[in-house]
Swiss-Prot record:
Entry annotated with the keyword Cytoplasm: yes
Recorded catalytic activity of this chain's protein: O-phospho-L-seryl-[protein] + H2O = L-seryl-[protein] + phosphate; O-phospho-L-threonyl-[protein] + H2O = L-threonyl-[protein] + phosphate
Entries under Pfam families matching the protein: Metallophos, STPPase_N
GO cellular component annotations of the record: chromatin; cytoplasm; nucleus; pseudopodium
Disruption phenotype: No obvious phenotype. Simultaneous RNAi-mediated knockdown of gsp-3 and gsp-4 results in male sterility due to chromosome segregation defects during sperm meiosis. gsp-3 and gsp-4 double mutant hermaphrodites have egg laying defects and no viable progeny. gsp-3, gsp-4 and him-8 triple mutants have incomplete separation of sister chromatids during the second meiotic segregation. Mislocalization of MSP in activated sperm. In addition, have partial reduction in mpk-1 phosphorylation and air-2 association with bivalent chromosomes in the most proximal oocyte in response to MSP.
Family designation: Belongs to the PPP phosphatase family.
Name of the protein this chain belongs to: Serine/threonine-protein phosphatase PP1-gamma
Organism: Caenorhabditis elegans
Alphabetical list of PANTHER family matching this protein: SERINE/THREONINE PROTEIN PHOSPHATASE, SERINE_THREONINE-PROTEIN PHOSPHATASE PP1-DELTA-RELATED
Gene expressing this chain: gsp-3
Lineage: Eukaryota, Metazoa, Ecdysozoa, Nematoda, Chromadorea
Superkingdom, taxonomy of origin: Eukaryota
EC number: 3.1.3.16
Tissue: Expressed in male germline including spermatocytes, spermatids and spermatozoa.
GO terms (BP aspect): amoeboid sperm motility; cell differentiation; egg-laying behavior; male meiosis chromosome segregation; regulation of pseudopodium assembly; reproductive process; spermatogenesis
Amino acid sequence: MTAPMDVDNLMSRLLNVGMSGGRLTTSVNEQELQTCCAVAKSVFASQASLLEVEPPIIVCGDIHGQYSDLLRIFDKNGFPPDVNFLFLGDYVDRGRQNIETICLMLCFKIKYPENFFMLRGNHECPAINRVYGFYEECNRRYKSTRLWSIFQDTFNWMPLCGLIGSRILCMHGGLSPHLQTLDQLRQLPRPQDPPNPSIGIDLLWADPDQWVKGWQANTRGVSYVFGQDVVADVCSRLDIDLVARAHQVVQDGYEFFASKKMVTIFSAPHYCGQFDNSAATMKVDENMVCTFVMYKPTPKSMRRG
């Protein structure tokens, strides 16, 4: 039986940790995190595998545990439910505050299920976040591998794709050679850790490549890279105008491909503390016009740790 959840109280403590630099483990206990996962899982399960949402909405790319940068996005655009958001995955790994990041987002999902949408990224898969930081953080901060496992159960229910105003198809990674119709996306099974190969794996892992025509094996060792011709074909076949995806660091936070039929959005500035990239978010207004907000890396003197 899941313990009752006071989502407002948990959100205020998570936000206070972000604003004050307080310690998460003294503010939020493991049972509360487990309850948050369980409640969020039921919300994901109640919604479709292809999230069909209407504008206006803000689309955000990778966050990777950069909690203060997530808060910058809300400060700049507003908080739900005043503003609608669609995040394209990769909430955990690499950054320093993975647990704060994913839990605040799950709280927003629970409290505002029709205003706040989260797709799954490849880092919301156990084989990846076991290695790239999230497992270690759960273990170090809460001394709990069970907590990590409970997060995986929630991640397995996350949708893999979204459709804004019937015209903008969104996913974390990219397209699939097996994708022929939107109904295939509506029928993607959950819960699951997508098998390799599958449409699900491609949605999480595939990348555009300006030097490729058609499909080629991806140097990541998973899925494919695809050319501009593929994007044009898919937009025509699915009757869409734009594909929005994340998954790759781009210098200005956003980058177009295939005559502006695809855009990559990356929302973690100064990624990993090693890149000097800006971040960006994409606003889709009521008329389906897309504009971008950029977030410069914060000066070194302002960065925590």
